[in-house]
Design a protein with these regions (language model features):
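Short acidic, gly/pro-rich beta-turn/loop elements at beta-sheet edges
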Residues: 8-9, 18-21, 33-35, 89, ...
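Conserved alpha-helical substructure of the radical SAM core
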Residues: 44-78
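Surface-exposed beta-strand edges and their flanking turn/coil or helix-capping segments
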Residues: 11-13, 22-25, 52-55, 129-131, ...
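Short, flexible active-site-adjacent loop segments at beta-strand->alpha-helix junctions, enriched
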Residues: 3, 14-16, 27, 85, ...
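N-terminal [4Fe-4S]-dependent radical SAM core
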Residues: 1-25, 60-73
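Canonical Radical SAM [4Fe-4S] cluster-binding loop centered on the CxxxCxxC motif
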Residues: 14-58
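Short, low-complexity, polar/charged sequence segments that are solvent-exposed and flexible
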Residues: 5, 17-20, 28-32, 45-46, ...
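Conserved AdoMet/S-adenosylmethionine-binding subsite of the radical SAM
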Residues: 65-170
Length: 170
């Protein structure tokens, strides 16, 4: 929960040797209303707020404390930014969070251990490639524009061709 009692989703994904954390970047989703992805429960929730970089980092700290409390010695070695919210609509805070993740004096996670997921906002994908450059996961849902328009209405604004071109740039 944040200071206003908003629930913030964070997920730990265990494997034999380590844990992966899935963090959220928003309470609700900027793609809600007319742009909501039809399959996504978060898309039914109006955007309450973008999470700050420190609120995203706090998810990592809470997860580490949880693991310690339960005696889990496996480290959190990977971070996937694909919880609640569209990552690229909270660009600056997500970029700052990733910078903190990679700081040697901080969490010290390598670029190859971090993946950002997006439904595809072409200009932000290109900017992210130039400024950040961690792994990128595209929620494609369909290679057909007509089908994708129904599943992810934002596709009408950012058609598949533009999204794919931005991914090639990436």
């Amino acid at each position: 929960n944040d200071e206003n009692k908003n629930l913030i989703e964070v997920v730990l994904i265990p494997s034999k040797s380590h844990n992966t954390i899935c963090v959220s970047v928003q309470v609700g989703c900027a793609m809600s209303k007319s742009s909501a992805c039809i399959h996504c429960a978060t898309g039914t929730q109006l955007l309450v707020k973008n999470l700050s970089a420190s609120e995203i980092v706090m998810q990592m700290m809470i997860a580490k404390r949880y693991l310690n409390d339960f005696g889990d010695q496996r480290l959190i070695k990977n971070c996937v930014i694909m919880g609640s919210g569209e990552s690229l609509t909270n660009y600056e805070n997500v970029k700052e969070f990733i910078k903190i993740l990679m700081e040697q004096e901080g969490i010290h996670m390598g670029k190859k251990s971090i993946t950002l997921s997006t439904i595809g906002i072409p200009d932000k994908i290109k900017k992210f490639a130039d400024e950040v450059g961690v792994y990128l996961a595209l929620s494609l849902h369909s290679g057909d524009n007509a089908k994708r328009n129904k599943i992810i209405p934002i596709n009408k604004k950012y058609p598949l061709k533009e999204v794919i071109e931005s991914c090639k740039y990436y």
